Amino acid sequence: MLQANTSRRSHWPPVIATALGYACFSLLGLALHGWSPLWFVWIGERWSEGVIGGRTGYDGQFVYYLARDGWAALPHLDAPAYRAGRVLYPLSAAALSGGSADWLPWSMVAINFAAVVAGTAAIARWLAARAVNPWWALAYAGCAGIVFAYSRDCTEPVAYALVAAGTIAWLDDRRGIGWALLALAPLARESTVLFAAGLAAAALAARRWRDVRALAATALPAMLWQAYLTASVPAPTIGGIGLLQFPMAGAFPIADLDPGRLAALFLLGLPALALLPGALAWTWREPRVAFGWLIALNVLLVLIAPNQSWWHVLGLARVAVGAVVALLLAFPVLSPELRAAVAAFAVAPTLIWLGPMLWWAPWTAVR
């Protein structure tokens, strides 16, 4: 695997820039919405009060209910076993808040803020150690999926900070910490298992059987937790969680001239489709190199995302975070032109939708 460069430049400037940028984003969002941290939560009457036909809010509210109420939150979850499967973020928020309902929404923001900065730091350090400009790590901090997830108290910042740091640790032969982080990440978001799968595919091609077994075992904590939830949670899924589909099949049934859906198709869907053949060719040409596998698996996830994700570019951007991380980890062996294209793929939706992200206001229930 790629070796570190001892004469690397400091990775701290882009990390500091990320912290300052997200601090400004947070302050502006709070100032626009009455200084209430519940702006990040996006509570909707349908799930907070059980009002049929009420506003649905957004996914961060389910983290909030779980962190605040524990098992008592199950009636307020659209898909109880699925939402409770992403237990790491609400559990961390509940612990940080000390059980205080007043402090809980602030704790959620603080954890995601720290996660964004930590994920950026891990990627910037990886790049700097390999003589790549660490400022490229801002493509992660500024990618639409991370910015939007941060603004809605979703689980992606925690999940992808863990999986980025875990993948880097594994590639740097720090197997113990890498294994632990890769095992924790699916407890924040299940799709992060694709990173362990990509690493395992490369290890399998190299016949590193011990690594294959270890990487497969990273899925066990999340699998055991999900099995427990499936057996223990009686509440049915309400409204449903979309199933994965054939590539691009989620986009076409809902295709129209809505700006959010057009942006999902042209800014994320078609670029992902263009990336897939090259990534697959990389796995064929160099099957023992993890980068091709990581990119191919995460790009494929974007393409097979369900209809709900294609409904708006910001929803699909959350699915695409894994592809951005995988591509950034491959920057040391990518051309300057490809690096620029990846950065554009990551941040273009953010540049277009940053204003609406800040301006949109939910119904902020206090229950």
Feature-to-residue mapping (PLM):
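Short hydrophobic/aromatic helix or loop-helix immediately within or flanking a transmembrane segment
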Residues: 57-101, 322
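Membrane-lumen/periplasm interface segments of specific transmembrane helices
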Residues: 21-36, 192-302
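Membrane-interface alpha helices of multi-pass inner-membrane proteins
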Residues: 163-169, 176-203, 217-220
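Start-transfer (signal-anchor) and selected internal transmembrane alpha helices
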Residues: 1-44, 339-342
